[in-house]
Amino acid sequence: MSTLVGVPVKNAEMWLKRFLEYLEQMKGVSRAVFYYALSPDETLKTLKEWAEEAPLTVEIYKDPPMQSVSSATIAPVYKELQEIMREGDETHFLSIDADIMKIPKTLIRSLKKQKKDVIAPYVWIEGQKPRTFYDPDVFRYKGLRFHQFDPPKLETTFEVDSVGTCWMATREAFTETEIDNPYPDRTFCNNARAKGLKVWADPRLSVYHLNTKPFGLHQIPLEALLGKPPDNTAYIRSDDTVVDIGTMPGQYIDAFVWGRVSK
């Protein structure tokens, strides 16, 4: 059972070599397909130099052009990856961002053996204290965002609404499910669930997302970029209690100023 790995990459020169080292060590990769978006640094040069010596099959494509602000995220890339997958013979697809670090060598095997339609490990921010979950905008459970400092902590794989950043899908789930903006990962999961497929998260498996703040890079909600009202979805904690959007700023202060997780 082979796995196609899809990687969107842009402005990643400063940390790309670290990611590529982890990718090389990951077992079960049959082919790695990169979609490169125009970058002012030497991301493309770094990627091409690595590809010449890489111990796996590597393909590099130019990112599809942006047609409008609403298409500014990576849905067009996913659509092209779906076509590449259809033309190949891989049984599974792994989507992973190029700023994911500390990837277990056996990640693909660990995800694949669970035989789920769509499944993801937990994604944490590298070196962040207190321990911080990376992307609650796409990781959702019971209609709520994962709490960043106290996400659901079930002891085994559990069914969720959506996942992102790093996830695996079977060939059928990936190629036969519509993907769209503004949150491609989330819309993919929602569309998959609408077709009767199931989406899962495994808290026993972890990868770490680069802490981009030291590089001066900050996540900006897509709603802000698109001029839409903010997403006021609340957060769910490990004990299933809910934290509303108005309470979260105080919890961020407790975490990052005082180093404690609010109860």
Residue ranges of each PLM-predicted region?
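Active-site beta-to-alpha loop of glycosyltransferases that engages the nucleotide-sugar donor
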Residues: 7-21, 38, 69
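Short, acidic, metal-binding catalytic loop of nucleotide-sugar glycosyltransferases
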Residues: 21-30
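C-terminal catalytic/acceptor-binding lobe
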Residues: 155-157, 161-166, 171-256
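Short beta-strand-to-loop acidic/aromatic patch adjacent to the donor-nucleotide binding site
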Residues: 90-101
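Active-site nucleotide-sugar/metal-binding loop of Leloir-type enzymes
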Residues: 76-92
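Conserved catalytic core of nucleotide-sugar-dependent glycosyltransferases
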Residues: 101-179
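A conserved acidic beta->alpha catalytic loop
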Residues: 35-47, 51, 64-66, 100
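Cell-envelope/extracellular polymer assembly enzymes that use nucleotide-activated donors
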Residues: 2-4, 187
